[in-house]
Amino acid sequence: MKETFKGENRVSITPDSAETLVKAGFHVVVQSGAGANASFSDAAYVDKGAIVLPGDDFYANADIFAKIRPPSEEEVPKLAGKTLVGMISPSLNKELYEDLAEQNTNVFALDCVPRMLSRAQAYDVLSSQANIAGYRAMIEAAEAFPRFFAGQMTAAGKVPPAKVLVIGVGEFSSLR
């Protein structure tokens, strides 16, 4: 499902994940242009066995929808009687959640899956997205920093390595 939130460049289903679903026996329908902001063409999805359809045809031919951000007000009626999987944040979007419930939309709010060591850990989207955000933050910090992050020793002289303080916990804070 194409992301409609301004500035959202992620996509919930990549061509490779579409191929995995197709091999598992699912018919995968992708909304035309869904992967464009993430640099995935419609042709890449077709090459992996997915069917690419425009707007209304897409909604009419799919039963389960995957999305990163919560659906927009315009998308909600199109999901009536269907299933939505994604980061819905029901505690922050109570009205949206109630609207989806009123029209019998099944919702799997992946951001509500418990974050603990268990079988559910494979569905912990918050940790994976936080890891990506932390990695990107370091790349952007390195780009904004006026000199090299790593120390340099050249014939022209020596540049000491940057000292960086990472505030937080998790896997990314252990990267060097």
Label for each model-derived stretch:
Residues M1-S39, P146-R176:
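Glycine-rich phosphate/diphosphate-binding loop of Rossmann-like nucleotide-binding domains
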Residues E3-F5, S32-G35, D57, P70-P71, ...:
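Short, ordered loop/turn segments at secondary-structure junctions
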Residues G7, A62-R69, G81-S89:
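Extracellular/luminal Protease-associated
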Residues K23-H27, A50-I51, I64-K67, E102-N106, ...:
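Generic secondary-structure signature for well-ordered alpha-helical cores
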Residues F40-A50:
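Glycine-rich loop at the start of a catalytic domain that most often binds anionic cofactors/ligands
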Residues G49-N61:
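Short acidic low-complexity segments
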Residues D56, I64-K67, P71-P77:
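Glycine-rich phosphate/dinucleotide-binding loop and adjoining beta-alpha-beta core of small-molecule
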Residues E73-K163:
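Glycine/serine-rich phosphate-binding loop and adjoining beta1-alpha1 elements at the start
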